């Protein structure tokens, strides 16, 4: 595969390979469940990207290769962002937060290798591409799992690049899960009663699915954010059969129209979705394919859904971007004192932890109310935990401690809000309330856990005039003497690193937070 066209899937594969983060699987594998099971085990082990090059039934089809697990671990995220190995989770989020503040708009070019091969008319056949049947109970082969679905807002002319699942239901048809409260769901309404033009991008640089699966505000174009991460514009070319633009160096592009007429719908699903449970089947709108373009020797990109303890996936890794976007949104809404945000991986962002410099009573409640009012909250922020700066939001033990000793339900530290819109894929909601076609979304009752120190207590002399009992910590001078004599004690293990020494004394934190 040539890699001389700038940022694209091939340059990304080369980056992974040079960092020992790619495995080329040359032995025969089956698209029917085997790829899914291999991927599940590999992701659980934090393994490399997998490039399957010998897929049964696809030895001589238009596309013979399939890539997955290419942003499935932290090292791959560091590589994608140009960060050193060992960069911590908090630093990754901060890097993304800053990058998303500096959008780089795309530029339109005349041509690109994605049009090296053009497929039209009776030659269109989606089964020429090795889309897996990922799980035993899936309704069919899911080609749209880690792609970029491009639509345009008829009013503003702004592109939306989203990540929406799709199942092959015929040679030229893809049934799509449609949630009206999503970005492209709004576009779908604008085009009614006419079909909506759609372009689906399979395989470009992995900033594409990373951004397409992230909850940017409606006035933000994902192309701009991809450019921000790459440090250069995304080169786009015009499609021929739909009025849209796609990356000039994409591997595969499907053009078509999504019809709102229920008479054209097809059964989509079931599908084992991101919560780790099997979703249900339902009639869904269908993309009728009008044209396919692809590079020579193209590579299809896809990913495995289904998160549960011990089994994260590429979608959960996207929570780095989601956390950064949410942090920026809170700041844009005028919420002061936000010092960190983390949308947990196993919850796929349904649990959101926010660290604050608490400045007033009700600060945590303000944070939760702001989160619940954002457009992306249909999928995220079901449960919100707010903590202070002495709690490491990436440490589940620290969060457990804060939840145990700073939350008192009888004092209003737990608050419920709802029913509200929520994810239609959450199995904790009764199925009759998860009908996205009827309601536009599912239904949640949301919860805030205020795990900050209560300001309801009066300052007490024995607490040093604080509102809350002080944390037991070691005097810095004493700790320094212990560190100096550690080897002398003969304990036989290395002394604490700088991070844990600060945790022991809280010397730096005490200078900023009087309540510590």
Task: Name each region found by the language model.
Residues 1-286, 290-516:
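Extended, highly charged
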């Amino acid at each position: 595969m040539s890699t001389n066209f700038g940022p694209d899937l091939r340059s990304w594969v080369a980056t992974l390979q040079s960092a020992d983060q790619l495995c080329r699987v040359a032995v025969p594998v089956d698209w029917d469940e085997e790829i899914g099971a291999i991927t599940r085990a590999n992701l659980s082990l934090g393994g490399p990207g997998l490039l399957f090059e010998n897929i049964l039934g696809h030895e001589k089809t238009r596309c013979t290769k399939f890539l997955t697990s290419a942003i499935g671990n932290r090292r791959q995220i560091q590589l994608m962002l140009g960060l050193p190995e060992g960069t911590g989770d908090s630093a990754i989020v901060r890097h993304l937060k800053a990058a998303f503040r500096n959008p780089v708009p795309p530029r339109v070019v005349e041509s690109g290798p994605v049009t090296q091969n053009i497929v039209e008319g009776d030659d269109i056949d989606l089964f020429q591409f090795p889309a897996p049947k990922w799980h035993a109970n899936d309704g069919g082969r899911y080609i749209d799992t880690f792609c970029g679905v491009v639509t345009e807002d008829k009013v503003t002319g702004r592109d939306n690049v989203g990540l929406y699942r799709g199942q092959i239901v015929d040679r030229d048809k893809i049934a799509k899960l449609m949630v009206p409260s999503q970005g492209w769901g709004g576009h779908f309404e604008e085009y009614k009663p006419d079909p909506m033009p759609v372009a689906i991008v399979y395989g470009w640089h992995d900033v594409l699915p990373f951004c397409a699966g992230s909850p940017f505000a409606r006035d933000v174009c994902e192309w701009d954010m991809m450019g921000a991460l790459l440090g250069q514009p995304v080169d786009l070319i015009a499609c021929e059969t739909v009025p849209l633009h796609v990356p000039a160096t994409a591997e595969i592009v499907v053009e078509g129209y999504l019809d709102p007429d229920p008479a054209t719908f097809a059964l989509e699903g079931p599908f084992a979705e991101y919560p780790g449970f099997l979703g249900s089947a339902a009639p869904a709108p269908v993309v009728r394919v009008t044209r396919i373009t692809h590079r020579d020797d193209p590579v299809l990109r896809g990913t495995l859904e289904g998160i549960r303890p011990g089994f994260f996936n590429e979608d959960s890794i996207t929570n780095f971007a989601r956390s950064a976007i949410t942090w920026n949104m809170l700041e844009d809404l005028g919420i002061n004192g936000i010092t960190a945000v983390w949308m947990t991986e196993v919850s796929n962002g349904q649990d959101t932890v926010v660290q604050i410099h608490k400045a007033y009573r009700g600060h945590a409640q303000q944070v939760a109310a702001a989160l619940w009012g954002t457009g992306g909250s249909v999928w995220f922020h079901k449960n919100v935990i707010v903590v202070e700066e002495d709690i490491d939001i990436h440490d589940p033990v620290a969060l457990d401690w804060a939840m145990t000793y700073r939350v008192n339900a009888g004092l209003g530290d737990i608050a419920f809000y709802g029913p509200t819109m929520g994810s239609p894929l959450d199995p904790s909601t009764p199925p009759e309330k998860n009908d996205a076609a009827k309601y536009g979304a599912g239904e949640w009752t949301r919860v805030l856990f205020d795990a900050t120190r209560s300001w309801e207590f009066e300052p007490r002399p024995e607490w040093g005039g604080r509102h809350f009992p002080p944390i037991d910590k070691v005097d810095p001078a004493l700790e320094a003497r212990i560190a100096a004599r550690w080897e002398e004690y003969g304990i036989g293990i290395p002394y604490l690193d700088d991070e844990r020494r600060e945790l022991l004394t809280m010397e730096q934190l005490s200078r900023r937070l009087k309540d510590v």
